[in-house]
């Protein structure tokens, strides 16, 4: 639902000029690494103390060692941050519109905020309040990444996508 709402909001105010193709190839690595980060983060949360349903003395958890899966999660985040920094550098170097550069910086800022919360919760015994803030931050980061992805995406018309133009056809958005 968050992705659908973000796409709908972004498409409603689209600039009719698509970004140059030299910037488009960054959108999928960033989006893919973000998805991998969220999945790995879900595994970390599902393996930790604030997971599953509580039934007396039994708490259902995923069978992963928290330090190991947290390292996997952190490694994916580091790769994502490096790709975002590279993208921002490329956007600055090629004179991309300020809005695209700003959204790239927004993604980077949200990732840095998330990393700070994640490390703090890991080294302070995973307090439940920080887990909640980290999940909220993951949602904000996902929205920022989708917004940035859409900025770097071609228009549906440029792809030859005419679906949704007629009233009897379903409207399908192209990410």
Put a short name on every predicted segment.
Residues 1-175:
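Polytopic transmembrane helical bundles with strong interfacial aromatic enrichment
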């Amino acid at each position: 639902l968050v992705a659908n709402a973000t796409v709908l909001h972004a498409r409603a105010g689209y600039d009719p000029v698509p970004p140059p193709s030299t910037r488009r190839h960054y959108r999928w690595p960033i989006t893919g690494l973000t998805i991998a980060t969220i999945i790995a983060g879900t595994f970390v949360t599902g393996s930790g103390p604030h997971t599953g349903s509580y039934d007396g003395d039994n708490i259902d958890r995923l069978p992963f060692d928290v330090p190991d899966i947290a390292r996997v999660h952190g490694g994916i985040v580091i790769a994502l941050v490096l790709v975002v920094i590279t993208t921002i550098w490329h956007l600055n170097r090629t004179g991309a519109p300020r809005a695209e550069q700003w959204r790239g910086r927004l993604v980077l800022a949200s990732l840095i905020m998330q990393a700070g919360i994640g490390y703090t919760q890991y080294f302070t015994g995973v307090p439940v309040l920080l887990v909640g803030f980290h999940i909220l931050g993951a949602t904000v980061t996902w929205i920022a990444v989708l917004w940035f992805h859409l900025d770097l995406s071609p228009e549906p018309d440029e792809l030859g996508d005419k679906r949704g133009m007629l009233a009897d056809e379903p409207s399908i958005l192209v990410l």
